[in-house]
């Protein structure tokens, strides 16, 4: 079998990581794997893992170059001659739609998010099979596009059970990290994700203030990069921290490397997103490391968290409810690794994706 995945870019992100992981697993199974993208930080990993990265602009929304790019993509697809084209985003889906007109290769799309409703987004439903990363996404596209039930398969994102394994903790990294940020004997409440308004870090910070009344040694750890256009938002968060006298209780770590070790050193992980997450990869990864997760009560995370067992939900913007759940999280004991292994493994994602391909 020969598979082509098409994605706008290969920079760091949940969708991109999923493409890299599938490429690696395809190769292990003897499948010829190709990834077409405009490139990025992760493009070399495709080739290192035994796949084939083809650099081509499937990212730009410029309609004036679209015709030229459709012709170029058609030539690439004819040369590769794949059994399946798997599109991961709307621009690639439109380019593939026109490039594939005379090639008639079977197309699979994965809907990764709650995209704006309209003609532009409807392209994802034109594929021969549609994969949704959560039941929330499935309900969303069925509501807005009336997509046929037998065309849709829900396949949650797969978690790398070797990387996110509580038995594979890097004690040296954790010891050095705790020493650098003075986290020894602290109750660490982490939140992972780019610093943007959608992550609602204001609510996270206010909840730390409330939790501090009962947990004096609490520390909020915000982990994620900051784009240049979000610098003002970061400044506003730092002003809020100063205003609430939390400068010794909130830490920013602007890198997403060694994220599995960040989960390992945390006591609880928070997802305070204002916008529903399509799946909630960070939630599943945290639980896999046996860490409770508290998340806003919407989106794909509702498929992952079992309330009062491995985490809790709170309403968007409710810092008091979040703080109360932080306190309650101290009593939770569970086998998160076993739960994720059974329900959200990379193997499960791979096997079910291949099943979709073979049924076309």
Q: PLM ranges: what are they?
A:
Residues 4, 183-199, 205-208, 221:
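Conserved donor-binding/catalytic core segment of Leloir-type glycosyltransferases
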Residues 35, 292-295:
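Short hydrophobic beta-strand element within catalytic cores of glycosyltransferases
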Residues 77, 255-256, 262-266, 281:
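Short alpha-helical donor nucleotide-sugar binding micro-motif in glycosyltransferases
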Residues 87-93, 111:
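Short His-centered aromatic/hydrophobic patch
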Residues 101-135, 139, 146:
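A conserved, positively charged/aromatic
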Residues 229-234, 247-256, 262, 313:
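Active-site donor-binding acidic/aromatic loop of nucleotide-activated sugar
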Residues 306-308, 312-319, 326-331:
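Conserved acidic donor-binding segment of nucleotide-sugar-dependent glycosyltransferases
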Residues 321, 328-346, 352-355:
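A short, well-ordered alpha-helix in the C-terminal region of glycosyltransferases
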């Amino acid at each position: 079998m020969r598979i082509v995945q098409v994605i706008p870019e290969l920079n760091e992100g949940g969708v991109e990581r999923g493409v890299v992981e599938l490429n690696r697993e395809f190769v292990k199974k003897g499948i010829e794997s190709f990834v077409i993208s405009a490139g990025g930080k992760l493009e070399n990993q495709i080739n290192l893992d035994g796949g084939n990265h083809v650099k081509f602009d499937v990212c730009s929304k410029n309609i004036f170059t679209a015709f030229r790019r459709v012709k170029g993509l058609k030539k690439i697809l004819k040369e590769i001659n794949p059994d399946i084209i798997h599109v991961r985003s709307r621009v690639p889906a439109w380019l593939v739609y026109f490039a594939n007109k005379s090639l008639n290769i079977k197309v699979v799309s994965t809907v990764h998010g709650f995209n704006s409703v309209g003609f532009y987004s409807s392209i994802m439903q034109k594929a021969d099979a549609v994969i949704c990363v959560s039941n929330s996404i499935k309900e969303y596209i069925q509501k807005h596009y009336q997509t046929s039930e037998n065309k849709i398969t829900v396949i949650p994102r797969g978690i790398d059970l070797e990387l996110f394994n509580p038995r594979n903790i890097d004690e040296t990294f954790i010891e050095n990290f705790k020493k650098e940020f003075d986290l020894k004997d602290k109750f660490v409440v982490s939140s992972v994700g780019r610093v943007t308004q959608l992550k609602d870090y204001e609510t996270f910070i206010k909840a730390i203030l409330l939790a501090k009344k009962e947990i004096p040694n609490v520390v909020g750890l915000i982990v994620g990069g900051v784009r240049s256009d979000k610098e003002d938002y970061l400044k506003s968060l730092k002003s809020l921290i100063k205003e609430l006298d939390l400068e010794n209780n909130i830490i920013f770590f602007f890198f997403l490397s060694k994220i599995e070790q960040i989960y390992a050193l945390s006591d609880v992980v928070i997802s305070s997103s204002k916008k529903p997450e399509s799946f909630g990869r960070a939630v599943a990864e945290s639980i896999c490391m046996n860490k409770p997760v508290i998340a806003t009560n919407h989106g794909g995370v509702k498929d992952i968290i079992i309330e009062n067992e491995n985490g809790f939900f709170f309403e968007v913007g409710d810092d008091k409810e979040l703080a109360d759940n932080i306190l309650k999280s101290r009593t939770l004991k569970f086998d998160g690794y076993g739960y994720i292994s059974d329900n959200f493994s990379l193997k499960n994602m791979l096997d079910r994706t291949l099943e979709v391909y073979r049924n076309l």
